[in-house]
């Protein structure tokens, strides 16, 4: 089963950064839940952990909500990962394998080291990326993917067509 805590928390953090840039001071857990395609209780659990680790702050109650606790440029993706994953291993070997040969006997130790190395490399990568830089990259992807769609739509409806009209 795929663990979606990190991508969901990252989407929440990116949404809060975007909201801040658009002049929306706070978002409710219900609003964020709609955006991430989840239920508010799941979002609140993630927000509680992010708040505990100083990544978001909020106001409780009917008119409350959450926002980033620091500027988006000062929050790394590694901080978000560590906050919501809470130190659990990235992967783990099966424990129910009978020890019959060199592979099955040492698989657990080998896989633990492999997992540790992979997670260290991933955290190095995530440490070099911030919420702000990630939002910038998303904007760039949006521009790249939206431009061809806009051009195709304008051709379909005849915008920018300098040739004779068929109407």
Residue ranges and their predicted role:
Residues 26-37:
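A short alpha-helical element within helix-turn-helix/winged-helix DNA-binding domains
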Residues 1-13:
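Short alpha-helical segments that sit at the start of domains
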Residues 72-97, 115-117:
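Conserved segment of winged-helix/HTH DNA-binding domains
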Residues 40-41:
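The DNA-contacting recognition helix of HTH DNA-binding domains
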Residues 46-53:
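Basic amphipathic alpha-helical segments that dock to polyanions
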Residues 94-167:
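C-terminal regulatory/oligomerization modules of transcriptional regulators
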Residues 53-69:
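Beta-hairpin "wing" of winged helix-turn-helix
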Residues 12-19, 83:
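Short amphipathic alpha-helical elements of helix-turn-helix/winged-helix folds
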């Amino acid at each position: 089963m795929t663990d979606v805590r990190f991508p969901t928390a990252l989407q929440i953090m990116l949404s809060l950064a975007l909201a801040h840039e658009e002049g929306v001071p706070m978002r409710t857990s219900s609003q964020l839940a709609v955006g991430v395609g989840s239920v508010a209780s799941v979002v609140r659990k993630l927000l509680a952990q992010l708040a505990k680790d100083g990544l978001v702050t909020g106001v409780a109650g009917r008119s409350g909500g959450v926002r980033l606790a620091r500027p988006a440029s000062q929050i790394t993706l590694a901080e978000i990962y560590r906050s919501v994953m809470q130190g659990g291993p990235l992967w783990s070997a099966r424990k129910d394998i009978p020890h019959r040969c060199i592979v099955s006997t040492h698989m657990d130790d080998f896989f633990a080291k492999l997992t540790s190395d992979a997670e260290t490399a991933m955290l190095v990568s995530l440490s070099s990326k911030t919420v702000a830089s990630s939002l910038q990259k998303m904007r760039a992807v949006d521009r790249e993917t939206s431009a061809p769609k806009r051009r195709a739509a304008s051709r379909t409806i005849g915008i920018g067509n300098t040739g004779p009209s068929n109407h």
